């Protein structure tokens, strides 16, 4: 069994494709076929997964299809439809010291350069212009905020990320 923090959902198994056990694949990776860079997959729902290896894959109509080891028939393929595809966190490439996976930033305290605690990173998302941190404000926030959205702009807004202390220092006006 895996703990949620030890695994990452990278995609989902879709409907059967044909009668020989092929399945459609939805990939959540930046590059559509990036999901195939990771092996084995942990297929299932949180806490109830099994390792599966991709035998073959190809693009099909702007999507992906794959033949998985042990999935031989349409019925086999139907039995895994809509299951998550996860990988172990250790399978991700190592990043340089000043680079971070978003999952590492979630849960960190965000503090201004003046020492004001803005709250905890709840999630990050893309806007097209730049990435944004959604911060859950402290219950007794002096400015009455429940949540804040702060751009994740290295050097301009984000001044320092401290993995050990689990803090992100920002140049940001807490009243905004």
From Swiss-Prot:
Keywords, alphabetical: Chaperone, Cytoplasm, Ribosome biogenesis, rRNA processing
Cellular compartments per GO CC: cytoplasm; ribosome
Highest taxon of source: Bacteria
Keyword Protein biosynthesis: no
Molecular-function GO terms, alphabetical: ribosome binding
Free-text note on domains in this protein's UniProt record: The PRC barrel domain binds ribosomal protein uS19.
Quaternary state and interactors: Binds ribosomal protein uS19.
Name of the featured protein: Ribosome maturation factor RimM
Organism of provenance: Pseudoalteromonas atlantica (strain T6c / ATCC BAA-1087)
